[in-house]
Amino acid sequence: MLEKLKERVKNWMQKTGAETGLSKEFKDIFEVGGVPAFNQFYYFGIFIWKYLYKGFYSPWHRILAPTIENPRNRRDLERMDVAKAVSSELAGLIWSEQCEVHVSQSDSEEQPLEEFVHDVLTKNGFWTKMQEHIEQVLALGGGAIKAWYEVKRDSAGNEIPESGGIRLGFCMADQFVPTAWDNAQVTDGVFISREAKDGYYYTRLEWHKWDGLTYYISNEAFRTEYKQPNPGMTEAQDILGFRYPLNEIYPFLNENTSMQGLTTSLFAYYRTAAANNIDDNSPLGVSIYANALSTLKALDICYDSFIREFRLGKKRIIVPAQCIRTIIDPQTGEMRRYFDASDEAYEALSTDSPDSLKIQDNSIELRVDEHERAINAFLSILCLQVGFSAGTFTFDRATGLKTATEVISENSKTYKTIKGHQLQVKMAIAKIIDAIVQIASLYDMKWNGYSIKALASRGWETKVVFDDSILQDRQTNINEGILLIGNGLMSKKRFMVEKLGYTEEEAVQELVEIEKESSISADMVDMAEQAGQEANAINPNEEPEAKEEDEEAAEDES
């Protein structure tokens, strides 16, 4: 009873403080206690990368363009959106829906735990959503995937029986702040989620932290007034505002939850493979184009000049101002002009000199080739800076930005970059699968009659295999493996694990099956030979008699 009273008093004070403005207003999450001081890295790193990824960063793309009419006129730069294109292209090479996730427990054919994990991943759209998330991670330097158990409710708020399931959330770098980490991984963190409602922005902070062997999840809410966003700059919803009662916005969400028996955090933070050369004490990653900002800016300037070359270089015919005045035809009495006043090709020039009273074609030669060469030069520099092989991106006047799609050799820079990022993705997937299994065990979930808790007690091995067919020739890998095995330089098991994507257990099981088939084939050959020998022993003259009969038939025909 006393706890409920305290809760009501706290909620009343928070709500009153937010409505009257008497309580403390938080400008951003870094003013909240327990959050590391990463504000410089977020404001001058992640937020800038985010605006470039979205295609508009105000300090770059809103420039001064003075005119005679308005010396302070500003305009928006034409943009190539290369940051988005580079992130999208690399994400497509890293991830494919052909990616395989194996969760094996033994050498048996049935793998119920793997089937359960695949069902959870499929229901959450993991196979298609993951490529989008990798693209965002590459652009912003990092991101997180979190797992939780959720029960559906009806319109009255009542829980629907047998509706519980595991959900996955994909968070961008600006929606997550790590609060504890070691050399291997981020262990604690806070997730930031926002929504707009009734003229206010509501922000929920979801804290994940360890205290000994106990895992805690806590939630708190903040409210700030809705303000018109300023594109390309810090957005209004980035301001937290005042603390607000959680149950006013999320009535079915617990403020504090503790869990025992977990061995891993219920989220997986992963970053780009590039080293953080901006803040080497931070566990956060950097964007793939973090060190190519000047090149991205130069590309937008060149592209803007290329577009304006056609706009400013349009055909102009300079005519004397006297020639475009209206005159009255003495014969008809109608108003007439010597030139079409609605034709934008004509520009009037007023002059007092009789020598200047002549029509001049003032057309400008377009510098298309020069712009094309300049853009391609900067694209070559960009490929070097983001880890692509030279010539991966090119610009063509007819088709615009193009991407090379040739098969990539193992020695190419692009291939090495892809494999480095794939390693980060593999570790994140393995960790989130561990979280899925542990949540299912905690809530004693069932799958096709199996208890996930009982299955998990036997242990499991997770293996993520990427489809490298878009990177290299699969047949080349197979031929190379056959050559190494034939010369005794590689075991069959190792070849199946490293090149064909088998887990250790699957490789052993497959080798046993191959040995059985080989044994059966050898026995069948021996049986066939033995049967033939027995038949010859019973009737040794059968073949010669048949031969004589064939010769007699041939003589009769002749």
What are these regions (language model features)?
Residues 244-410, 446-450, 455, 465:
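Extended, charged amphipathic alpha-helical segments
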Residues 509-558:
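Extended, compositionally biased alpha-helical segments that mediate assembly or anchoring
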Residues 45-46, 51-58, 62-77, 350-385, ...:
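Extended, non-catalytic structural segments that build the interaction scaffolds
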Residues 109-113, 122-130, 137, 291, ...:
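Short amphipathic alpha-helical segments
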Residues 431-461, 508-509:
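A glycine-biased, small/acidic residue-tolerant capping/turn segment at secondary-structure junctions
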Residues 500-509:
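Short, basic interhelical loop/turn and adjoining N-cap
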Residues 1-197, 546-558:
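Extended, helix-rich architectural segments
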Residues 131-140, 144-286:
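Extended, regular secondary-structure scaffolds
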